[in-house]
């Protein structure tokens, strides 16, 4: 069986009072209503990282609007944003169907971007450090369930963490990211290419969804199946096939690193010994 996924590049920009701006929301909702039959055939609609730029838990109006949209298009919605709870501020991927069904909390945090390493020392170096609130990391490897398929989501730079990649055993992997901070720089293509390598490494389809970067459907050999251009709001429809098990790269890849390191050391020692 094949599963259909929608990668949505629009973001849910909101005012400070939690209301979604009509210009963006109106377009997004009209797109959903006008293509209701197409969305109904989808098994999930995925929005980019920070697609909701307010705390969903603290803004019930925003949460209700997302639930209403999911109900209107008859499709689960995977959105993301920062929420505050008993653990502090957390970066999360949230599945609506149409109510909140499952939540994944980002486990690998980006140094200086999401927390300040060695904070006590950093605060002595820069007075602005104290104004930065650390984000709290999650601990659970959430496996989302939609109809007869399962998938995992990694957020932004989590895709560079080998430990998290080794844990991917679901049918496909979703990457939600926000490249807006980097503007039109090589970083946009760099992160996409890392995702392509990861898709080949785990031999799975990988919907890659970015706010401003190159939103793409990536095949299990790292090939680009379809994509939309940078900075262009768009909805990308595609199909992904389910995969099972783990690859040799996931299972034994870590050992190759040690073999390469100690092998190189051994060759250097042998070379030095041969010169004597």
Q: Model-derived features: where do they sit?
A:
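Enzyme catalytic cores with a strong preference for nitrogen-chemistry domains
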Residues: 1-276
């Amino acid at each position: 069986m094949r599963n259909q996924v929608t990668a949505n590049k629009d973001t849910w920009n909101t005012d400070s009072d939690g209301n979604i701006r009509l210009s963006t929301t109106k377009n997004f909702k009209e797109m959903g209503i006008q293509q209701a039959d197409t969305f109904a055939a989808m098994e999930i609609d995925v929005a980019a990282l920070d697609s909701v730029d307010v705390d969903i838990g603290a803004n019930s109006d925003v949460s209700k609007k997302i639930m209403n949209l999911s109900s209107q298009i008859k499709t689960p919605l995977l959105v993301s944003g920062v929420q505050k709870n008993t653990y502090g501020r957390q970066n999360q991927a949230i599945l609506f169907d149409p109510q909140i069904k499952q939540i994944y909390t980002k486990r690998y945090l980006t140094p200086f971007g999401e927390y300040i390493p060695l904070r006590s020392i950093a605060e002595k170096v820069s007075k602005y450090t104290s104004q930065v609130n650390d984000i709290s990391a999650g601990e659970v490897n959430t496996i989302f369930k939609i109809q007869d398929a399962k998938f995992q989501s990694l957020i932004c730079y989590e895709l560079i963490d080998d430990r998290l990649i080794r844990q991917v055993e679901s049918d496909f992997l979703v990457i939600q990211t926000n490249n807006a901070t980097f503007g039109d720089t090589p970083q946009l293509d760099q992160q996409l290419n890392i995702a392509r390598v990861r898709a080949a490494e785990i031999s799975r389809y990988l919907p890659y969804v970015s706010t401003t970067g190159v939103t793409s459907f990536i095949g299990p050999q790292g090939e680009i199946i379809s994509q939309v251009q940078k900075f262009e709001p768009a909805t990308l429809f595609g199909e992904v096939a389910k995969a099972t098990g783990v690859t040799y790269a996931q299972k034994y890849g870590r050992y190759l690193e040690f073999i390469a390191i100690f092998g190189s050391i051994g060759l250097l020692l042998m070379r030095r010994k041969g010169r004597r």
